[in-house]
Amino acid sequence: MKLSSNHKNPIPTVDIIIELKGGVVLIKRKNLPEGWALPGGFVDYGETLEYAATREAKEETGLDIELIRQFHTYSDPRRDPRHHTITTVYVAKAQGTAIAGDDAKEAGVFQKEALPDKIAFDHKEILNDYFSRRY
């Protein structure tokens, strides 16, 4: 099947639920849309999803992670107001201290009961699915 030059495809992304010190790591975004978010980002050409997840985690939190499992894929075309993205979410564990890097203003570890109010994208839904062990 030949695609025309005006054919648009969704953009692949990864997000990572990093388990650390009894909570999960979130970053406060420097760029729009504002709010707290799971570490993650765009998959670069030639990368595997797993490599992109470990790279994004390191860039945004300074943490070296160990991927535990692929959690779920989220594909609602409205999940990111900038583009139609499809994200594959991983669960990972890490040791050390999360520090804001790359496009993060802050990094923090949050318990289920103390998640921030303003969470970007569909990451509140993802976190709810994770904490309820939906997948």
Where are these regions (language model features)?
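Acidic, metal-coordinating catalytic segment for phosphate/diphosphate chemistry
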Residues: M1-D15, Y130
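Active-site-adjacent beta-strand/loop module that shapes the phosphate/pyrophosphate-binding cleft
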Residues: Y74-A98, Y130, R134
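A short coil-to-beta-strand element that immediately follows conserved catalytic motifs
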Residues: L63-H72
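NUDIX/MutT-family hydrolases
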Residues: V89-V91, I99-S132
